[in-house]
A protein has these predicted regions:
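Extended non-catalytic accessory segments flanking core domains
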Residues: 1-173
Length: 173
């Protein structure tokens, strides 16, 4: 899956996949400007278990343009992206950043974080590279990070921030 973002706020991102039977491989790099066409859906039967009701673009075709750099993350709070927030779906596919967070719980699949709002949000490593995955495995309850950043998505029944690399994890304070 790929995350596509046009802007830096709510409703500016989407998750998409390239068709499995694509004849020409498409090579995209983070920060590339792309033109994508496809079908918007909230229910893709091929992805029900993993992505459930995630708004997705399917049967996508992609034209890669020039490198323009990564989008600016939407700075949000745990209150904005907790599981039952009023507009939580509006951040799907958007690069989000949360500042001054505390790891509040660790389990086998994800990490819960809180901030000054008192709400809890989830971090996940499904999109993480090996270095980020290793760093996340060292996080413990009570650790404080100056910021976390990642692509916001819905998978396996929960909304979460998908960490991509070590830079997304900020500094432990």
């Amino acid at each position: 899956s790929y995350a596509l973002q046009d802007g830096d706020g709510q409703w500016d991102g989407i998750i998409f996949d390239l068709p499995v039977d694509a004849t020409e491989p498409v090579i995209m790099t983070r920060g590339d400007e792309v033109t994508v066409t496809g079908l918007i859906t909230d229910n893709d039967p091929d992805w029900t278990f993993k992505f459930g009701g995630n708004t997705r673009l399917i049967n996508a075709s992609v034209e890669v343009g020039s490198a323009v750099g990564e989008p600016t993350p939407a700075v949000v709070s745990c209150e904005d992206v907790h599981q039952i927030a009023d507009e939580v779906e509006s951040y799907e596919g958007v690069l989000v950043q949360l500042n001054n967070v505390t790891v509040s719980a660790v389990n086998d699949y994800d990490w819960a974080i809180t901030d000054e709002t008192g709400f809890e949000a989830l971090l996940d490593d499904d999109m993480a590279n090996m270095a980020a995955d290793n760093m996340m495995s060292l996080l413990s309850e009570g650790d404080v990070l100056d910021q976390v950043m990642g692509v916001f998505n819905y998978s396996f029944g929960t909304y979460k921030i998908q960490i991509r690399d070590v830079a997304d994890l900020g500094t432990t304070m």
